[in-house]
């Protein structure tokens, strides 16, 4: 089913040249701060300007439909520059798997992250030697884990050249380059032929689509008949009321802090799956499970939920005190020229997004893990 929204024209040469100027050889750095300090300042300023032009001086009270349409028209550029700015901060603060998860007693942070990935692979039924597509693969953390868990061959699709370089670097490092490959592309207009993959998954990535029918329709097209697609989707719950300014403020905070042009509700997400032709096998808000600790506890800095002393070094960075210290330090590094301009502004936007995520979760307005599993009919 073709997308009904205007698509951005792709220019891979332009994007590759920009990546080379902005990121240089930082894709091979250790990650996090080490990579962040290697950026080209002028190129980073371009990325900052291109991204924040959609959000600066925009409030929930004053936001118009035209504002949202302007973002969706440049959905690919908005997302690409968001990850030009945020990738190293993500790796520093969270790791190489850019998603949330559920937690169990006695389970460390990274064990929980891996279990969340395994659960999706099991729901889809990914098996050895299957040809699988990861839509919006980030730096390849989930692809590496699922490849090891299932022995499948996974292709990661990403519109950010820097993340593709990092994903490729990590795959080689881990001896997985025979199972993994990473491809540049816009998931609203994939270059793969029809019926190419045995299975497809997306982990908190298709939220960047300007219209879910567009990306789900492309997934349906490239999936083989009888194949299964599974997704952890970011959605506003059906408690969300767009006429409520507080609700809109929470949604806008999540969008600006996470590179999202147009987040929709659970009802709209389910409708999108059905509209493109998927037979829904299962759908569920995993955030509504009766878990002993909430999915958002790390970004809320709720240290009482730590299950391992090693988690402290990850989670302490998320506390409000640590954020203030780190963001102030980033500002100092910018001033003396050791960090590129826009580093603090980006970190502040991510912090605003984290606060929006927590507020949305506590008010039952948002979920980052609405599980949908759909099958493409044989006929």
Swiss-Prot record:
UniProt key word Iron-sulfur: no
InterPro entries xrefs: Erg6_SMT_methyltransf (IPR050447), Methyltransf_11 (IPR013216), MeTrfase_SMT (IPR030384), SAM-dependent_MTases_sf (IPR029063), Sterol_MeTrfase_C (IPR013705)
Pfam families: Methyltransf_11, Sterol_MT_C
Coiled-coil residue windows: none
SUPFAM superfamilies, per the entry: S-adenosyl-L-methionine-dependent methyltransferases (SSF53335)
Pathway(s) annotated for this protein in UniProt: Steroid metabolism; ergosterol biosynthesis
GO MF annotations, alphabetized: identical protein binding; sterol 24-C-methyltransferase activity
Catalysed reaction equations from the record: lanosterol + S-adenosyl-L-methionine = eburicol + S-adenosyl-L-homocysteine + H(+)
UniProt EC number: 2.1.1.-
UniProt key word Transferase: yes
CDD domains named among the record's database cross-references: AdoMet_MTases
Keyword entries, A-Z: Lipid biosynthesis, Lipid metabolism, Methyltransferase, S-adenosyl-L-methionine, Steroid biosynthesis, Steroid metabolism, Sterol biosynthesis, Sterol metabolism, Transferase
Entry's Gene Ontology cellular component terms: endoplasmic reticulum; lipid droplet
One of the protein's GO biological processes: methylation
Further comment found in the protein's record: In Neurospora, the biosynthesis pathway of the sterol precursors leading to the prevalent sterol ergosterol differs from yeast. The ringsystem of lanosterol in S.cerevisiae is firstly demethylised in three enzymatic steps leading to the intermediate zymosterol and secondly a methyl group is added to zymosterol by the sterol 24-C-methyltransferase to form fecosterol. In Neurospora, lanosterol is firstly transmethylated by the sterol 24-C-methyltransferase leading to the intermediate eburicol and secondly demethylated in three steps to form fecosterol.
Similarity comment: Belongs to the class I-like SAM-binding methyltransferase superfamily. Erg6/SMT family.
Protein name in the entry: Sterol 24-C-methyltransferase erg-4
Organism classification: Eukaryota, Fungi, Dikarya, Ascomycota, Pezizomycotina
């Amino acid at each position: 089913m073709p997308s009904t929204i205007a698509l951005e024209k792709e220019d891979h040469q332009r994007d590759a040249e920009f990546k080379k100027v902005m990121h240089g050889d930082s894709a091979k750095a250790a990650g996090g701060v080490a990579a962040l300090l290697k950026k080209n300042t002028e190129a980073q300023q371009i990325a900052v300007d291109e991204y924040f032009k959609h959000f600066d001086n925009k409030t929930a009270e004053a936001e118009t439909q035209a504002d949202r349409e302007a973002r969706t028209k440049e959905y690919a550029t908005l997302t690409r520059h968001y990850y030009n700015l945020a990738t190293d901060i993500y790796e520093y603060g969270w790791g190489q798997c850019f998603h949330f998860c559920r937690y169990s007693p006695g389970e460390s942070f990274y064990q929980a992250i891996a279990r969340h990935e395994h659960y999706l692979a099991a729901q889809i039924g990914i098996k050895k030697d299957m040809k699988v597509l990861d839509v919006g693969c980030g730096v390849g953390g989930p692809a590496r884990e699922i490849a090891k868990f299932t022995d499948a061959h996974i292709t990661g699709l990403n519109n950010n050249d820097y993340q593709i370089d990092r994903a490729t670097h990590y795959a080689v490092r881990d001896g997985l380059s025979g199972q993994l490959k990473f491809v540049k592309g816009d998931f609203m207009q994939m270059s793969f032929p029809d019926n190419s993959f045995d299975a497809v998954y997306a982990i908190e990535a298709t939220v960047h689509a300007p219209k879910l029918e567009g990306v789900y329709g492309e997934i349906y097209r490239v999936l083989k008949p009888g194949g299964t697609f599974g997704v952890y989707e970011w959605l506003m719950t059906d408690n969300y009321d767009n006429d409520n300014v507080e609700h809109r403020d929470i949604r806008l905070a999540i969008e600006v802090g996470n590179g999202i042009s147009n987040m929709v509700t659970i009802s709209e997400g389910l409708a999108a799956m059905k509209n493109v032709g998927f037979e829904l096998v299962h759908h569920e808000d995993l955030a509504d499970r009766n878990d002993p600790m909430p999915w958002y506890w790390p970004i809320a800095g709720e240290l009482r939920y730590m299950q391992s002393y090693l988690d402290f070094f990850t989670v302490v960075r998320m506390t409000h005190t640590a954020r203030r210290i780190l963001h102030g330090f980033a500002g100092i590094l910018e001033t003396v020229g050791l960090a590129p301009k826009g580093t603090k502004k980006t970190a502040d936007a991510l912090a605003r997004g984290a606060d929006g995520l927590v507020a949305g979760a506590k008010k039952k307005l948002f979920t980052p893990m609405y599980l949908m599993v759909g099958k493409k009919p044989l006929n």
